UniProtKB/Swiss-Prot annotation:
The lineage of its organism: Viruses, Riboviria, Orthornavirae, Pisuviricota, Pisoniviricetes. Disulfide bonds join C21-C158, C153-C187, C165-C246, C284-C294, C329-C354, C372-C425, C384-C603, C930-C941. It is found in: Virion membrane; Host endoplasmic reticulum-Golgi intermediate compartment membrane; Host cell membrane. Fusion peptide 1 (FP1) and fusion peptide 2 (FP2) function cooperatively and have a membrane-ordering effect on lipid headgroups and shallow hydrophobic regions of target bilayers. They are considered as two domains of an extended, bipartite FP. The membrane-ordering activity is calcium-dependent and also dependent on correct folding, which is maintained by an internal disulfide bond in FP2. It comes from Rat coronavirus (strain 681) (RCV-SDAV). It is a single-pass type I membrane protein. This is Spike glycoprotein. Residues 1250-1290 are annotated as: Heptad repeat 2. Residues 1-13 form the signal peptide. PROSITE patterns: BCOV_S1_CTD, BCOV_S1_NTD, COV_S2_HR1, COV_S2_HR2. Residues 906-927 are annotated as: Fusion peptide 1. The gene is S.
Length: 1360
């Protein structure tokens, strides 16, 4: 059992293996050989590589945990080296100097059984750190005589260790000098641990998280247990294993083995037994089988098809680009310069288009710490930036705490402000005192204008640091000197004086008489640091980011001179000084501001790689000038890159394009495929069959998608690439445990796997669970048979809906609401404490809730919803989602009968066009429907009204121009152009006809108006008569009531005559306490009302919140998609919805189809085939159609055959019935005690004194009403109305009979002739001719013609 020694070894003992730090140089002829890679892979199935997090255990549990674990199946590297005389001095460089990143897992060989004579360590020592100098912490785990010495100290690790194999030791007999620190280093942990010295292998788990280092240990190949942890506060970036002793010369001595594999943050599935021991573990991302186990949280998943979500194509290569041959930034030279400024005059330098090595920079300046803001410090290594701006200054020892982020001490308030919002790193380092001098300088221009001198004021040593304790700003006209003529007469308090520079004003001084002496009272006395004189023009100021202190304070009494204003050296105040030295080193602060992260050509070369070729068409990782990610490159021809531009971004800030400065080619960058993998897993199979949906196998293997290294077989199907299954789609099965969809099934057979050596046992077959004939031949209903109505026909319906999503904000002045301007009430309201504040706080929360809801609604609308309208054809504008053509009306050629144009114009057109109203007797509307807005159809749309052709009498400008042009042309060139005047003439005649028929209708209307108005006058007369009668009755009743009231008051005065006297006595006895009680009652009442109002506001806001959530839901489900819910988006089955902003809410227009007719069918919840297999419908019903079972959808009756596409196969035909619980609301009312008993309980022996009330009848003024004057006025008004009777004149009308056209008379004559000829022949042929001729003889003698004419009857006008 591992335990900790309480005693520590002496700190001077720093033994690591057999190494000593002696200045003897080994050779650099050859590099150290590369670490060997193990043939053994990491197998985590038994818990290897895992750890008990802080020794926590779980009993009989299987759960998912996320931590730092190795990748299952990864390789080990042996990081151990054998120390020899010829060991290369490059042994501590990569690859043996390795990245620590998240952590490492180590498997270490215990060499105790074959330990060389004299050796005290059983395995090599591991060192984990960043720069391995005494300015940062280093973790060392050193074995020594059966213990492990763990330490975390600020070591300076020896980089050139020397072994005992070297014969020349230089006379140095000291053993154990493995670091070069001359004095004991600063440590945060030094502890000793025992370990099982008899174990063959030792296992270590090292990782870092949030600045804390964790170490775990085990002596068996299972989960490790907690060893120690310590907060370091910095990122450990590298590690190496010290070479182990000389090459053994004794036979049987083993070589050291230190097998290491990296850790990454991964999710593992653990199984804990009844003792809390990890018995098995699964790396969830290592294989598809592992992912299935983690998905089901079971070590033995059930047989089934699992969709593996979050699947992404794995990159197959790396595209790396850096600008080569850039100069070195030489940042370390500037940081280590022999002069450094003070905080008062901090310096900045910007580095751009150059490279730097951060690791060597930190070693060069012997960095104490490096911490970053808004970026992980470990990520700065190897990144690129647009530029790096660095500020630096020496740190006064007493003010070091001021530089912590978030502090507001003197340094950050008045000297240098750190921008916590910027991406920056804070570097603390030190230089030897002999190599640096502090430059103290005051950059203030207005201080220097009045005589400030750095040497005279600061007179500091080489390592003294000046800093400001306060900063002051002044105006352009400021001058600290008093005016000589003003202070000349002063005897006491007389300051120095001098003339001020041009454009400035002297210090303000007032001369005051004090006895026989005059006294000067001047501004800013005694010091601007302590004065509160508002006349003092030196104003304190705080620093902004990037600002220097504007100036130190000035003791104005010490400013003067014989001519020009000048201040003495000791006149400047508000600064202090301290040394920067500690341990003979000057400590310096530097702020590195990283501009343009992952873009630009200012790069760290710590992990720089050689440039690679750009591979197109496959998924690759990329690192383009520090911008990292993965994607697919496609070469394109692009001319939109500027000369300074290499990367192209989209509107979301994602990398979209890349210009290669090496080849000058341009590329388009697309993301790697992220899709869906279905895994068909069988419990008896070692691995699943895989279906990469919608992907060809070539793409799968070219992009290294599959995590299976060597699949046995694969092929393309119409569902995608199938891996680890045989293609047997020509076979069909009627039972399937692994259904892939679309009628395909993966069938697993152990026998099939055994028969074929290259088979996994999986086959992709066709799944046919049943046929239509089987269903109808051997089927019975499951769960009963029911009648149901299913729609067969629909109609489209529109439904408008308003949903309130916000309300006006309310704020209340509580004091004004309760008390108004009454002072006593306001004073007493203070006793109610924070009631008013609580009211306003609640209303503030309500208003904030309104803002939050409005933001949520706006977010839902912004994402994919357009509120602008669809404009009608002929109007320019963007075509969007909502049609507002009913609002705009009908414009252009699309207008036809029945459209909006025929029904009227819209409100918008009323504004855009002049409007002319016509009297329409029935033909104007028909004319508009015919033209449809096309004026050229004017004569083609002539209307007929009672046999007369008519047109509307109003012409547009274009029609007038056209007809005028035609008439002019007909007059200019007769007779050839005479036809051009015909349209004009017809138009005029038809419009005159239209005016004539309109006048007749107007005449009839006049008659109706006159009759109606005369009837109204008569009704008004009757009304006034009734009013006059009613007023007379009112007068009599009021007077009678007044007389009765007078009698009543006379009677009451005898009984209540003492009322006024009693009230006066009561008022005189009210004291302040009683008055306050009355005020208190009023305040309570009003506060109760206010509280009720606020409660109602909260209640209403709850309803609005619910409706706003419903509005968001309807935007997402109705507007952005088609809702499957019935009657949710309108009434019926949803088609589409439109949304528009409305006052305090949203206005929805839903379109849906509503059933208009139904059919009644027999429906069964399920069917049973052959008594053993059940069928259930998918999104529909099983119905009987002409004796056969069919499937139909639930929304529309359309019977079709039952197949596996519309049904679900069940293992049995059993039906489970569940009885619904009978739960009723409690409607009983609690019995209350008798009201009188409860009243008597609280009010006993209560008496009231009846006051003596008297009443003075003389003070009551009883008035009798006399309404005769008002009634006379009404009677006069009736008389005037009678005299204003209107006698309307009737407009005359004309009746016009139109002569029939000549061709009508011609047809009548021809018909008569034909009749006569027919009669003649009939008479001749029948023997009746003699009779006919006799009778017609006389007719022939009197034959004559008659002409019909036009008769016009004139009805003269007359008066009624």
């Amino acid at each position: 059992m591992l335990f900790v020694f309480l005693t520590l070894l002496p700190s001077c003992l720093g033994y690591i293996g057999d190494f000593r730090c002696i200045n003897l140089v080994n050779t650099r002829i050859s590099n150290a050989r590369a670490p060997s890679v193990s043939t053994e892979v990491v197998d985590v199935s038994k818990g290897l590589g895992t750890y008990y997090v802080l020794d926590r255990v779980y009993l009989n549990a299987t759960l998912l945990l996320t931590g730092y674990y190795p990748v299952d199946g990864s390789m080990y590297r042996n990081m151990a080296l054998m120390g020899t005389n010829t060991l290369s001095l490059n042994w501590f460089e990569p690859p043996f100097l390795s990245e620590f990143n998240d952590g490492i897992y180590a498997k270490v060989k215990n060499l105790k059984a074959s330990l060389p004579i004299g050796s005290a360590s059983y395995f090599p020592t591991i060192i984990i750190g960043s720069n391995f100098v005494n300015t940062s912490y280093t973790v060392v785990l050193e074995p020594y005589n059966g213990i492990i010495m763990a330490s975390i100290c600020q070591y300076t690790i020896c980089q050139l260790p020397h072994t005992d194999c070297k014969p020349n030791t230089g006379g140095n007999t000291l053993i154990g000098f493995w670091h070069t620190d001359l004095r004991p280093p600063v440590c945060i942990l030094k502890r000793n641990f025992t370990f099982n010295v008899n174990a063959e292998w030792l296992y270590f788990h090292f990782y870092q998280q949030g600045g804390t280092f964790y170490a775990y240990y085990a002596d068996v190949s299972s989960a490790t247990t907690f060893l120690f942890s310590s907060y370091i506060g910095a990122v450990l970036t590298q590690y190496f294993v010290l070479p182990y002793m000389c090459s053994p010369t004794t036979s049987g001595v083993s070589s050291p083995q230190y097998w290491v594999t990296p850790l990454v943050k991964r999710q593992y599935l653990f199984n804990f037994n009844q003792k809390g021991i990890i018995t098995s573990a699964v790396d969830c991302a290592s294989s598809y089988t592992s992912e299935i186990k983690c998905k089901t949280q079971s070590m033995n998943p059930n047989t089934g098809v699992y969709d593996l979500s979050g699947y992404t194509v794995q990159p197959v290569g790396l595209v790396y680009r850096r600008v080569r041959n850039l100069p070195d930034c030489k940042i370390e030279e500037w940081l280590a310069a022999n002069t450094v400024p003070s905080p008062l005059n901090w310096e900045r330098k910007t580095f751009q288009n150059c490279n730097f090595n951060l690791s060597s920079l930190l070693r060069f300046v012997q960095a104490e710490s490096l911490s970053c803001s808004n970026i992980d410090a470990s990520k700065v290594y190897g990144m690129c930036f647009g530029s790096i701006s660095i500020d630096k200054f020496a740190i006064p020892n007493s003010r070091r705490v001021d530089l912590q982020l978030g502090k507001s001490g003197l340094l950050q308030s008045f000297n240098y402000k750190i921008d916590t919002r910027a991406t920056s790193c804070q570097l603390y380092y030190s230089l030897a005192q002999d190599n640096v001098t502090v430059i103290n300088h005051n950059p203030s221009s207005w201080n220097r204008r009045y005589g400030f001198n750095d040497v005279a004021t600061f007179h500091s040593g080489e390592h003294d640091v000046a800093y400001a304790e306060a900063c002051f700003t002044v105006g352009a006209s400021y001058c600290p000197c008093a005016k000589p003529s003003t202070v000349y007469s002063c005897v006491t308090g007389k300051p120095k004086s001098a003339n001020c520079p041009t454009g400035t004003s002297n210090r303000e001084c007032n001369v005051q008489a004090s006895g026989f002496k005059s006294k000067c009272d001047c501004t800013c006395n005694p010091s601007p640091l302590t004065t509160y004189d508002p006349r003092c023009l030196q104003a304190r100021s705080m620093l902004g980011v990037g600002d220097h202190c504007e100036g130190l304070g000035i003791l104005e009494d010490k400013c003067g001179g014989s001519n020009i204003c000048n201040c003495s050296a000791d006149a400047f105040v508000g600064w202090a000084m301290d040394s920067c030295l500690s341990n003979a080193r000057c400590h310096i602060f530097s702020n590195l501001m990283l501009n343009g992260i992952n873009s630009g050509t200012t790069c760290s070369t710590d992990f720089q790689l050689p440039n690679t070729e750009v591979v197109t068409g496959v998924c690759v990782k990329y690192d383009l000038y520090g911008s990292t990610g993965q994607g697919v490159f496609k070469e394109v021809k692009a001319d939109y890159y500027n000369s300074w531009q290499n990367l192209l971004y989209d509107v979301n800030g994602n990398l979209n394009g890349f210009r290669d400065i090496v080849t000058n080619k341009t590329y388009l960058l697309r993301s790697c495929y992220s899709g869906r993998v279905s895994a068909a897993y069988h419990q008896d199979a070692p691995e699943p069959a895989l279906l990469y949906r919608n992907l060809k196998c070539d793409y799968v293997f070219n992009n290294n998608i599959s995590r299976e290294e060597t699949p046995l077989n694969y092929f393309d199907s119409y569902l995608g690439c199938v891996i680890n299954a045989d293609n047997s789609t020509e076979q069909s099965v009627d039972a399937c445990d692994l259904r892939m969809g679309s009628g395909l099934c993966v069938n697993y057979s152990i026998a099939h796997r055994a028969r074929r050596s290259v088979s996994t046992g999986y086959k992709l077959t066709t799944f046919e669970p049943f046929t239509v004939s089987i269903v109808n031949d051997s089927v019975e209903s499951v769960g009963g048979l029911y009648e149901m109505q299913i729609p067969t026909n629909f109609t489209i319906a529109s439904h408008q809906e308003f949903i309130q999503t916000r309300s006006p904000k309310v704020t209340i002045d509580c004091a004004a609401f309760v008390c108004g301007d009454y002072t006593a009430c306001r004073q007493q309201l203070v006793d109610y404490g924070s009631f008013c504040d609580n009211i306003n706080a609640i209303l503030g929360e309500v208003n904030n809730l309104i803002d939050t809801m409005q933001l949520q609604v706006a977010s839902a609308l912004i994402q994919g919803v357009t509120l602008s309208s669809r404009l009608a054809d002929g109007i320019s504008g963007q075509i969007d989602d909502i049609n507002f053509s009913p609002l705009l009306g009908c414009l252009g050629s699309d207008c036809s009968e029945g459209t909006k144009a025929a029904q009227g114009r819209s409100a918008i057109e009323d504004v855009l066009f002049d409007k002319v109203k016509l009297s329409d007797v029935g033909f104007v509307e028909s004319y508009n429907n015919c033209t449809g807005g096309q004026e050229v159809r004017d004569l083609l749309c002539v209307q007929s009204f009672n046999g007369i052709k008519v047109l509307p009498p109003v012409l547009s400008e274009s029609q007038i121009s056209g007809y005028t042009a035609g008439a002019t042309a007909s007059a200019m060139f007769p007779p050839w152009s005479a036809a051009a005047g015909v349209p004009f003439a017809l138009s005029v005649q038809y419009r005159i006809n239209g005016l004539g028929v309109t006048m007749n209708v107007l005449s009839e209307n006049q008659k109706m108006i006159a009759s109606s108005f005369n009837n109204a006058i008569g009704a008004i007369q009757e009304g006034f008569d009734a009013t006059n009668s009613a007023l007379a009755k009112i007068q009599s009743v009021v007077n009678a009531n007044a007389e009765a009231l007078n009698n009543l008051l006379n009677q009451l005065s005898n009984r209540f005559g003492a009322i006024s006297a009693s009230l006066q006595e009561i008022l005189s006895r009210l004291d302040a306490l009683e008055a306050q009680a009355q005020i208190d009652r009023l305040i309570n009442g009003r506060l109760t009302a206010l509280n009720a109002y606020v409660s109602k506001q909260l209640s209403d806001m709850t309803l609005i919140k619910v409706s706003a959530a419903q509005a968001i839901e309807k935007v997402n489900e109705c507007v952005k998609s088609q809702s499957p819910r019935i009657n949710f988006c309108g009434n019926g089955n949803h088609i589409l919805s439109l949304v528009q902003n409305a006052p305090y809410g949203l206005y929805f227009i839903h379109f849906s189809y509503v059933p208009t007719s139904f059919t009644t069918v027999n429906v069964s919840p399920g069917l049973c085939i052959s008594g053993d297999r059940g069928l259930a419908p998918k999104a529909g019903y099983f119905v009987q159609d002409h004796g056969e079972w069919k499937f139909t959808g639930s929304n529309y009756y359309y019977p079709e055959s039952i197949t596996d596409k519309n049904s679900v196969v069940m293992s049995s035909c059993a039906v489970n019935y569940t009885k619904a619980p009978e739960v009723f609301l409690n409607t009983s009312i609690t019995n209350l005690p008798d009201f009188k008993e409860e009243l008597d309980k609280w009010f006993k022996n209560q008496t009231s004194i009846v006051p003596d009330l008297s009443f003075d009848i003389g003070k009551l003024n009883v008035t009798f009403l006399d309404l005769s004057y008002e009634m006379n006025r009404i009677q006069d008004a009736i008389k005037n109305l009678n005299e204003s009777y209107i006698n309307l004149k009737e407009i005359g009308t004309y009746e016009m009979y139109v002569k029939w056209p000549w061709y009508v008379w011609l047809l009548i004559g021809l018909a008569g002739v034909a009749v006569c000829v027919l009669l003649f022949f009939i008479c001749c042929c029948t023997g009746c001719g003699s009779c006919c001729f006799k009778k017609c003889g006389n007719c022939c003698d009197e034959y004559g013609g008659r002409q019909a004419g036009i008769v016009i009857h004139n009805i003269s006008s007359h008066e009624d």
